[in-house]
Amino acid sequence: MPSLWDYLNKDKKPVIKKVEPPKKKEIKRDIPLFIKYRPKTLDEVENQEQAKQILRDYVINYKKKYKGKALLLYGPPGTGKTSSVYALANELGYEVLEVNASDERDAIHIHHIVGEASKGKPLFHKGRIILVDEVDGLSGKEDRGGVGALVNIIKQSSWPIICTANDPWDQKLKKLREISIMVEFKRLSPKHVYNVLKKIVTNEKIKISDKILWDIAYKSGGDLRAAINDLETIIKSGIIDENFVKALGNREQEIDIFKALGIMFKTENLATAVSAFNNVDLEFDEIFPWLEENIPVEYKRLDDIYRAYYWLGKADIFRKRIIKTQHWRLLVYAQIDAYGGIALAKNKKYPGFTRYQPPKRLKLLAQMKEKLEKLREHVSKLREKLHMSKRDIIKYYVSFALKLKNLNKTVADKFLKAIGLSLKEIEEIR
């Protein structure tokens, strides 16, 4: 039986409400300013005119003029090395295959990634640039064969290979330097950094005083990436204030040992000489042999050389006392005697450029390390065949082969072939 409510509403049609699904909230994804304002063309890269010219010529004329050679871009961080490569690739319609040498460090990874990329053809681009970023990261025990593998790939590559480094003078990179065109990216001046910052705030319509932009530019130490990141920090904090900029502090810039030696040897000011090595990433004990090696390289007069070694000797006394007593407060006196004493040992400044040398003992250590690597490699090869311990192989077979080689090369060659080695391989570990 129908209810009273049904009777009263019998002529009314039911109202069906359309339920809208809830709208998805738009998530704003902020692109970092450094990425947003990365140069799109090579002309947009601030300064570095000579470097840009060499880079363009190398990539465009690689197959005609530069096949078998790499381009090694070096200089302080934030000077535009990586950005320049991407900007040129964008201009030419090339793809960039980037490998970070700090991540892909050994021969297997280098062969697998860079080796394959050096042969294949891009599907959607006119050409390819292989970028090995932070190639100075290829140093250390875990990187066996990494540089050697890269050098072999460069010699056969169908595409231009560009490497970047903050410090290209590492002994491990010697073979790479020999087949590379070295291109320096110089530290940017505050004016060049300011120009980029001004362009960003104008485009972003941000009100910020020129004084603050100049402060950021000076504090960056020529590192454009750091300056843009500092600008972004200030904008996002909402505190656009000179005191906030001061709170960010200055960026200490590492300098290489060669530059520090140049500052110390060329100055006649004690304070400049003593502070020359402040931003060098080496301990005093590691710097000491560099001083010892380069005094006669810089100084030509005997009395200057005598005085310089006299002060270095005084510093060495302090150094030995520190080792014996662990009184590290003496380090200051050792540094003053070493850096200040050597700088003020000369009667007058020597003009012109000096090519400083790494210590001979470092070269000898590097050579010894290379020979030990070869020895390990050959002993491992023999171990599979002879089923003996490494110690016994070196004691009985390798030492005998070395003696036999000096007595009779023909007999030595037959003996080595019988155990699976050659005269050339035994020469490598001599």
Curated annotation (Swiss-Prot):
Job of this protein: Part of the RFC clamp loader complex which loads the PCNA sliding clamp onto DNA.
Entry-linked Pfam families: AAA, RCF1-5-like_lid
- Asked if Hydrolase is a keyword of the record, the answer is no
Family label: Belongs to the activator 1 small subunits family. RfcL subfamily.
The protein's name is Replication factor C large subunit
UniProt signal peptide? none
Record HAMAP family: RfcL
Oligomeric state and interaction partners are given as: Heteromultimer composed of small subunits (RfcS) and large subunits (RfcL).
What processes does the entry annotate via GO biological process terms? DNA replication
Name of the coding gene: rfcL
Binding residues annotated for ATP, in chain numbering? 75-82
- Gene Ontology MF annotations: ATP binding; ATP hydrolysis activity; DNA clamp loader activity
